[in-house]
Every structure is written in C-alpha cells, then in structure tokens.
A protein has these predicted regions:
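Conserved C-terminal "switch" segment of AAA+ ATPases
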Residues: 62, 171, 232-238, 249-315
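Pre-Walker A (pre-P-loop) alpha-helix and adjacent loop at the N terminus of AAA/AAA+ ATPase modules
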Residues: 67-112
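Walker A/P-loop
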Residues: 104-139, 168, 237
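Conserved catalytic/switch belt of AAA+ P-loop NTPases
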Residues: 179-218
Length: 335
C-alpha cells in the first residue's frame, strides 16, 4: 500500500507528523462489488454491497501519524513512571522514524500486571502522544470467535471484524488497538478469537490481512498492537513469541503521588472549570489518592472537584474524595 507526506516536519511544533497511506486497493473492492448478485434481496448481500459502496465512497487513504520527535515523550515518563521500560521501547521506535519519511512501526507488546495499575490508561496516553485513535477490545466480555477477523457474509448476522472497522471506518492507518485481558479470551467460542492475531502480529502478513466478511485485503501492518494480561500462562506461545513482553509493576508510593498529581493537572487543564480550581493539590489529597489504583484516581478526582465546587471552594480537600476510596488502601506498592 502507498503513502505520501501530508504535513512537512518543522521545528518547534508538537503536532504529530502526518502522511496519507492507502489501506486497501479500490480495484479489489470494485471487483467484489461487480460480482455480487445484482438481483439478490438477501440481507447479507445487501449489507456486503453497502460495505463495498462505503469503502469506495470514502476512498482508501487514511492518516498515518507519528510524534514530531523524542523530546515530546518526556511528559509520559512523568505521568507513567511504572511504564519506563515500555516507554523506552516506544522511544527506540520513534528514534528510528524520526528525521525520515518512514512511518512509525512499533513491535506488538504485551503488558503483564495486576488489574488497576494503568495498563489501559497507558494505551490511551500513547495514542494521544501519537495523535491517533485507540480501539479497546475487552476479551473477557467477548465470546465471538470472529471479533478480530469478521464472519463470513454467508452467515446470518454476519459483520466485519474490529480490525476492518478500525481501518476502513476509522481515520487512521495506524490506530492503537488494545486487546484487553487477552488471557481471558473465551475458549468456548466456536472459532478461536485469537486466531487472527497469528497473521496480524506479523508485519509482512498483516500487509494483506483479509477480513472474512468483506474478503478484501487491507493493510493492517501499521496498527500499533497493545495486549494486556494478568497472567501469560493462558496465552498461546506462538502469540507470545510475536510480542515484546513487559511486566509492569505497581507504582511505588512516590510514583503513585506523581501519577495523582499528573492526573490532577491534566483534568484541571482539560476543562474550562479548571480555572476555578487551585493549580496544585494539597499534600494530604495526594497521599489519599496515592493509595488507590491509577484507574480509580481519575474517578476520585472528578468526585473531589465536584464536591469542592458544590461548596464554592477552589481547593479540593480529602473530605471531598469518595469515602470508600479515601478510607482504605487499594493498591499493593513496590517498596
């Protein structure tokens, strides 16, 4: 698939560098559309025809983005101090793509660690850094074997898979796709829900990935794959061998305070009402927040901000935080 530059690199800007990349060949779609039975009234063919027409209407080009440079990753090290090894790996890939016309290629990664330590939050922050989209696929609640690869148009209720949707219906050729809790993928599904990953996690075969519904090759080689798990023992070895594996530890108490302070500043800066809130949180508020898993900190802060404003105050106090969260430790710290 082809790509060409859209935004030239210029010093002093933090906007991502973007170019356009084709994620499918229109001639393939036109050929498939022509072969459909013109007079068929079967819903599956109508749905398939609609997908082909939509593909041709939108065209094949999508944004392919990458960070302007390594310095713009510095903030993530402050926000995600327990993900240093993962960020170092991404940083190496950014260095390879910097000062070149090449797109950013990131080796698929598996983030191993207990629930609540910020694995999904990391994925969101990485997507934001890259300027691309993030698609979350929670495997623990998905039972369909065709989740990633789509189901044949011959089947009732057939539809494209999530990879096809992310690339064809989305705006980016290199979205972040998070396969959350991959170790909990259902083993009772009629088809292996992880089967498509054998080709999707390999750069060469991902260049011509075929969704079973559309049966048109799409270029999924630029997708940034992040998988998460609590335990790697339930993941097939061939999939593990296709990824860089990182064991993410719970943050230390000091790191947890830093995460809480970063979330406080980020939420405040992201809302107009933030100007009514003190720029810095109180120390005892940070101490309280630092006892929570990162995934709970944001919810607690939003409650705290709201309670402070209900009382017409600019300062968030410990009493403003949720009682349950403020009253007990919820995270195992690294000492």
């Amino acid at each position: 698939m082809t790509s060409h530059s859209l935004v030239p690199q210029a010093p002093g800007l933090s906007l991502p560098v973007a170019q356009m990349r084709s994620v499918f060949h229109p001639v393939d779609v036109e050929r498939k559309l022509a072969r459909l039975q013109e007079g068929s009234q079967q819903r599956e063919y109508d749905n398939l025809r609609s997908v082909y027409e939509r593909m041709l209407e939108r065209g094949p080009e999508r944004f392919q983005v990458k960070p302007r440079g390594i310095p713009y990753m510095a903030a993530l090290y402050d926000q995600l101090p327990n993900f240093t090894d993962v960020l170092d790996d991404v940083r190496r890939h950014v260095a390879l793509a910097q000062d070149s016309s090449d797109g950013l290629e990131v080796t698929p990664m598996l983030l191993l660690g207990p629930p609540g330590i910020g694995k999904t939050h990391f994925a969101r922050q990485l997507a934001e850094l890259l300027g691309t989209s993030m698609n979350l696929l929670p495997m623990s609640s998905m039972t369909a074997g065709w989740l990633l690869s789509g189901s044949s148009s011959q089947w009732k209720g057939a539809r494209p898979g999530k990879v096809f949707e992310a690339l064809v219906e989305g705006e980016y050729a290199n979205p972040v796709i998070v396969v959350d809790e991959i170790d909990k993928a259902s083993s009772e599904a009629q088809y292996d829900p992880l089967g498509a990953l054998y080709s999707l996690l390999e750069h060469d075969t991902a260049q011509s990935f075929t969704d079973e519904f559309a049966e048109v090759a799409i270029d999924a080689s630029q997708v940034i794959w992040i998988t998460t798990a609590n335990d790697s023992r339930g993941i097939p070895d061939p999939i593990l061998n296709r990824m860089n594996i990182f064991e993410v530890q719970a943050p230390t108490p000091e790191q947890a305070r830093g995460i809480a302070a970063s979330l406080y500043a980020g939420i405040r800066a992201g809302h107009d009402w933030g100007r009514l809130i003190d720029p810095e949180p109180l120390d005892d508020v940070l101490d309280c927040l630092a006892q929570m898993p990162p995934r709970e900190m944001r919810r607690a802060l939003m409650t705290g901000f709201g309670n402070a404003r209900l009382d017409r105050r600019s300062t968030v106090e410990v009493a403003d935080l949720p009682r349950a969260a403020a009253g007990r430790s919820r995270i195992g710290f690294m000492q």
